[in-house]
């Protein structure tokens, strides 16, 4: 981060008074910019003992197989995000969902919340 999103001035990477770790702080307006982990919502969609996978169409890892998952949008629940990603990435409708697992990948600041459910009528498409 180089510039303040509040006023556009430059920022410094310092530990604010009363805090215990470095943050980006605006040199002009003193706004503290907190950078928090991103939440990834995804779905393990099952159909007749098979799992739905998607082939990645973009980087990173273009062409490799993955579960339908992605960044949450504002104003949606993690379940809504997981269902949206399944629909966007595989045109898949998933029912009877429940939270399957959560895990963190600290070095890239991501928290994953994966749901498990049934692929409706075994249908999905690119």
Annotated model-derived regions:
Residues 72-126:
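Unchanged
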Residues 35, 61, 106-108:
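Short glycine/serine/proline-enriched coil/turn segments at secondary-structure junctions
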């Amino acid at each position: 981060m180089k510039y303040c999103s509040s006023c556009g001035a430059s920022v410094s990477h310092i530990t604010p008074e009363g805090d215990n770790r470095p943050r980006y702080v605006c040199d002009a307006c003193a706004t503290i910019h907190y950078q928090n982990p991103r939440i990834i919502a995804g779905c393990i969609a099952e159909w007749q003992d098979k799992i739905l996978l998607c082939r990645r169409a973009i980087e990173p890892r273009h062409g490799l197989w993955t579960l339908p998952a992605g960044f949450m949008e504002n104003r949606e629940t993690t379940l809504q995000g997981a269902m949206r990603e399944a629909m966007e990435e595989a045109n898949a409708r998933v029912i009877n969902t429940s939270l399957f697992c959560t895990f963190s990948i600290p070095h890239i600041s991501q928290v994953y919340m994966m749901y498990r459910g049934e692929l409706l009528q075994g249908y999905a498409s690119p």
